[in-house]
Amino acid sequence: MPLLFRGIRGTLRASVRKRIHMSPAAESTAYPHLFTPLDLGFTQLRNRVLMGSMHTGLEDRARDFPRLAAYFAERAAGGVGLIVTGGFAPNVVGWLKPFGGKLSWPWEVRPHRQVTRAVHDNGSKICLQLLHAGRYAYHPLSVAPSKLKAPINPFTPRALSARGVERHIADYARSARLAREAGYDGVEVMGSEGYLINEFIAPRTNQRTDRWGGDAAQRMQFAVEIVRRIREACGTDFIIIYRLSLVDLVPDGSNWTEIVQQAQAIEAAGATLINAGIGWHEARIPTIATSVPRGAFAAVTAKLKPHVRVPVIATNRINMPDVAERILAAGGADMVSLARPLLADPQWANKSRAGRPEAINTCIACNQACLDHVFENKTASCLVNPRAVHETELVYRPTSAARRIAVVGAGPAGLACATVAAERGHAVTLFDAGSEIGGQFNVAKRITGKEEFHETLRYFRHKLGETGVEVKLDTVADVAALAGFDAVVIATGITPRRVDFPGADHPKVVTYLDVLLGRVQVGEQVAIIGAGGIGFDVGEFLVHEGPSSALDPARWMAEWGVNPTFEGRGALAKPAPEAPARKVWLLQRSPGKPGARLGKTTGWIHRATLKAKGVTMLGGVTYLGVDDAGLRIRVDGQVQLLPVSHVVVCAGQEPRRDLHAALQAAGINAQLIGGADVAAELDAKRAIDQGSRVAAAL
């Protein structure tokens, strides 16, 4: 080890020599390890909850910083120990996109002070993430260690010169120094997920022959020098988190020996904490989607922990306090990182500390309003919490004039509307003809890999009681029942659309609700008409049987090809998908790739899952008819007979508005929300957002 590293390490370890064992003074809580303070020597974190970095779309313009400050302030007030911002580039070529978030000049400091002040005023600490996009930069100025285009980006990067590498190291140090001036307690250096620093480290993307390439020791020098220069620039009383890729999940990634060597070199260079990074963005293995088991990658953090002396942070799919406590109590990490769970519920930490997990609005890892929005250049939000990143715009103010409100339909839109209206002080009655709340949530929870919807239903059951909503199940609301209310909101949902071709009324033809709700037992060969989100869900439901691999990390890793020991380059193994429960054809009338309109960050996962299960996916299909022999179709001019036992129709839906029409005829105004308003696709994101906004305006 170089003497310079030893000197820095000795200085820091003398102060940090981490007191990360259970403190006798830890407050009494159901999760004692989670709420033990973490002593870093020069500062102390109030608990072990890290709000992990997530881009929101508010980082890119100074005019949005008041909103960014409000967003972080709400999480700080919610009890988080340490917050990490979304990524800010250390220079222009490191932008994620043109004119993206950047901190490289003194005049860019002032807006950040709103953010740091808001967080500190609410008792938390905050680090700015330094993220250079490298070859993932979505602009023509991109640079990388070598001129190698990423498979997920149309731009080919320019290879940095040796002088350019030195300038970049200086840029990182300057940005960190500016972050300190802005009031940040530290920085997180993004060294994972396939961004610039990770590109230097992995042989996959570093083909250099100078001192910044070659063997593992030379490939990691870029990262080590960045940490060392930041420590020199910012002093010993400044947090440096290093986001270290513990599993790349791509061919020619780092192996375990190299990862340990890198962690130790980063520690010696001056890092305060090491945060686990899991997978590159171009990896074909999901790492954060809802089908990934909770805490699936915590074991790799536990594997690293004995090799370093600085605290290590476990991450990915840790969405409930029992998962976090289990990881910490087992000694597998010193902190846990949560990003999306704190979008879903800014009070996550406070509720956990109070022993109220039932009150947590749990992240379901859908990505629909957070990551998908960011990749579509929209401001992020959250499917289950539309106030996320919109705290200054969507405000649930106490009403000055309480009214009697009727909400008809206890699906996503109705539940959101009823609970927000009651929270504001209205007297709310929620009607539903069914025997349980949930509507389409009760369908979604049955899909393999979507078990998290059980948590959403648990949350709304709790919220209904907490806010005092009167719930009337097994009740068909009619005009007479609704006549005495001050306002009526209709959230009666949808009716599946029928198809029109010969044999559409054949007993083989069933709706997706028939299948998912168990009204029909389908045979061993099934055709699905419609390859939208519902069609893919039905496909996954039909090819799986028995307990879901989303509940079993070992089975899930075997299916996707993750080496359970995390050895080997990229921690890859040969995928071993389990045999499908039945043969399925997934069909769509429109030409092109089935599932093309699925979520930007999750669609590929659904397609890969069905492909691995042998599902035949066809576009440009003409349906000729159904008879006792099966389904006849025409594709590319060729007629085929699919010898199926059932044809499941997932061809859209129509709004259910019978009650609304009756109320209008009786002269009673009522507002439509959710599927009763727009039924193009079953869209819980839009339904909850609309229901919440309508309630906020009542």
State what each model feature region is:
Residues 308, 331-332, 467, 505, ...:
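Short, structured coil segments at secondary-structure junctions
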Residues 403-433, 437, 472-480, 484, ...:
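Rossmann-like dinucleotide/flavin-binding elements
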Residues 287-293, 395-397, 402, 443-455, ...:
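Short, contiguous acidic/charged loop-to-helix segments that flank catalytic cores in large enzymes
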